[in-house]
From Swiss-Prot:
Keywords on record: DNA-directed RNA polymerase, Nucleotidyltransferase, Transcription, Transferase
SUPFAM superfamilies (alphabetical): beta and beta-prime subunits of DNA dependent RNA-polymerase (SSF64484)
Assembly and oligomerization: In cyanobacteria the RNAP catalytic core is composed of 2 alpha, 1 beta, 1 beta', 1 gamma and 1 omega subunit. When a sigma factor is associated with the core the holoenzyme is formed, which can initiate transcription.
Protein's gene: rpoB
Record's protein name: DNA-directed RNA polymerase subunit beta
Similarity comment: Belongs to the RNA polymerase beta chain family.
Amino acid sequence: MSSSAIQVAKTATYLPDLVEVQRASFKWFLDLGLIEELESFSPITDYTGKLELHFIGSEYRLKRPRHDVEEAKRRDATFASQMYVTCRLVNKETGEIKEQEVFIGELPLMTERGTFIINGAERVIVNQIVRSPGVYFKDEMDKNGRRTYNASVIPNRGAWLKFETDKNSLLHVRVDKTRKINAHVLMRAMGLSDNDVLDKLRHPEFYKKSIDAANDEGISSEDQALLELYKKLRPGEPPSVSGGQQLLQTRFFDPKRYDLGRVGRYKINKKLRLTIPDTVRTLTHEDVLSTLDYLINLELDVGGASLDDIDHLGNRRVRSVGELLQNQVRVGLNRLERIIKERMTVGETDSLTPAQLVNPKPLVAAIKEFFGSSQLSQFMDQTNPLAELTHKRRISALGPGGLTRERAGFAVRDIHPSHYGRLCPIETPEGPNAGLINSLATHARVNEYGFIETPFWKVENGVVIKDGDPIYLSADREDEVRVAPGDVATESDGRIKADLIPVRYRQDFEKVPPEQVDYVALSPVQVISVAASLIPFLEHDDANRALMGSNMQRQAVPLLRPERALVGTGLETQVARDSGMVPISRVNGTVIFVDATAIVVQDEDGQEHTHYLQKYQRSNQDTCLNHRPIVRCGDQVIVGQVMADGSACEGGEIALGQNVLIAYMPWEGYNFEDALLVSERLVTDDLYTSVHIEKYEIEARQTKLGPEEITREIPNVAEESLGNLDEMGIIRVGAFVESGDILVGKVTPKGESDQPPEEKLLRAIFGEKARDVRDNSLRVPGTERGRVVDVRIYTREQGDELPPGANMVVRVYVAQRRKIQVGDKMAGRHGNKGIISRILPREDMPYLPDGTPVDICLNPLGVPSRMNVGQVFELLMGWAASNLDSRVRIVPFDEMHGAEMSQETCEAFLKEAAKQPGKAWVYNPDDPGKLVLRDGRTGQPFDQPVAVGYSHFLKLVHLVDDKIHARSTGPYSLVTQQPLGGKAQQGGQRLGEMEVWALEAYGAAYTLQELLTVKSDDMQGRNEALNAIVKGKPIPRPGTPESFKVLMRELQSLGLDIAVYTDEGKEVDLMQDVNPRRSTPSRPTYESLGVADYDED
């Protein structure tokens, strides 16, 4: 297929750098965030005030990391840099100053791709969206149906302050959800006189009631107010004025305990129209009085006061890596401060140095904990480039300081008008996290305060002005202007065509003439996320199916021979480039050397730059990372040019699947309920073959009986099983291994008790020690097979860090090619997913008039009810494109070029294709888009014409090889003694309550008895049954299930006298000791029954 791409609709602009949100935030942390934290703790003074330790934060430095990124991955190390900071110790008494550079810990560094390498694994820190600090006004209904108002002042850290009104028009205040206090008590405690307060209020008469109430309670002075405050906040402790003073001071006016943050100060100033400088991060009297004033205006419904919508994006902000890390550093420094103070007090004042005071451990621990186990530090999804990119742009409302799944209501999850151009309304998970985890829209960016902004073009007098950079607006700012959507039609000079334009204004829609429009959106794509923007004809799909389509593209497995989509949206190149999976030229220059492992570029100054390529590396999801060069020697390259294809890329574009010939028709019921019927061509031509790399690991440990040994000499193993092992007993690279083959030979010393009696006898007679080791080798597990692509040996001698107790670690990487097979899951880009139900020989598949057999038959009933008609447009456009030998790029929302544009474009392309020589049959005007197909088995035409065309289909990561599983015997749960569940635990299939009902309905008594006893938790019965099966004897009668015994014990523990009796009324002792080696069977088994007993039964 030629690579000439026809661009049908123009993209408005190139997208901005898609990983910017991660990189910019980490850069801010290194430039400002870390310094800010270090300096906020300086100086640290000891309890006597003699010594002071100053951190000179602006002079911190980072050492070059010990390992580079690749080395860190290989050694399971962390890609981190050591932090040093200059400390100054001042002795106040002698005036002596000691200055020293001190090591304060290791800081993991971000790689170029926006990820972190922690213990050899690539991780991503997900952005968190939280409620912005500031002041919020809400209304609530009380029990009597009267509306009351309240105001909450929410800091970045510290105590919440909540003012509320009640039915008697009194003002109350709560600190951190404690008991109500009269608001005027707080005012007096803060040292404000009645007149100070009344002068600041626009409606003082409303407040006078609260003053009277305070006087009635006998609180007329500052001291009384402080005592009252202390009583309410610290009930049960003896109150004192100084205690109250201290409490108030630390709760709200101490920068260490109370911090509004830059954002909180900015929001409060904006809401209450104050002009307090943003260096003042604590509460001020002015804040409190203005809040009261605003609340009273709300209560009286005057002065333009308005309530806040907490789900509005102007009131939610994004915390990215930098800020999350800064919070964690603060936790570490808090611990460090305590240690330093203790050491100052304990140590000898004269001989102390800064290095003795500063212990790096608490800071290291805090940072390690954040990267290793925080909810927001996630193992990177590396299935394909799109998955990686989307993961870095994810925005989660969960995590520390955020919401929890259980508490999040419907309003938080819902789409809000302020999401436009900021958060994608489509891409979110299905299930309990729906709406809590979102994706950043394509053009969105995060501003310095953490609010999401989106770009617009300015409109003046009905003309769109597109020179210069677009203007970014935050959600608050956007509400105040009239914004037209991105698909308004304009003349060539930028003048808006229509007489009335639909605009959004204050979260409502209205129609206005072009002169009143203030801004117009940049592009129709700016509303959606990167994954959704890769779906062609997105506007014809129902939103639920588009959601599945964008989620399933992230699960596409990189194929052996990827192929670009025939019908795309034009954003594929940038997605591939920004994902970080493809190598990009760092300089302008000429390629002077290319091979499979490296590309060398010579720049204009004659310097050589080597770009190394990855070969068959294992990704986090066991898919294969591999680079294939696409430049040749002598090619000119420019900065940012893609030089090699990564996995799931072709020609520098993302290529997640294959373009296959699809027919929408039923075939013998094999595509009932979303099943797929596919042709054998997909298997034989390796269209959907993917490479998967598994990692197997074994450690040789030090045991009590001596060290384990990695060796070729394994007891009781035939020589042919060792054919592929080297002299150390490790498999050679390139060997093909199947289930049960030895990868690494290992023997473990055996203790006395492990030895069978005949061994002991031999040793007693001959006195010589038989080689007492047992085979503990690493073998290929159950269903796996493949080729060994890499072996890595780690020992302490080489300087590798090993887990405690291990002498040697060996890792073997096995690659397998997986062809497509029955049970694999496939999907299109429009949420049309299905499982392969049958693979037909190509001669039996329906075929086209020119004899081409179809690749996949889809059920036509999958389209109407699901309303994802985009797949039909893609099908027809792909059919036209393949017959024109070209590729088509269509930007979503093309209706801006005219009504019914998609349909007209498809039809025009089909007519064009039919004009090609010998292609007249491609388009039938009586049945546009359909062809008469013939049955491959009989050669007879089908009754109805069928819609046929090329569609981009993906193979998803849910492969049947990884799911299929069977259990004969295996591990049991410790508590219930029932088999475990799941493939990883070698578990069984659960027969739950409803399955038991189904069997009861059929009266399958013996099946039921087995299910509830020997196949489950009758411990003795199952051992006897196994024994009987192995020896070929009849299976004995089942006994009592363990869970029944538990039930009996539970009922007895309630004080009920419950027991089990035989027919004769004899009590059965359920708790008798079960000893399988007893000579007399505990109950009749088939062996112990006489012939006479059989007859009676």
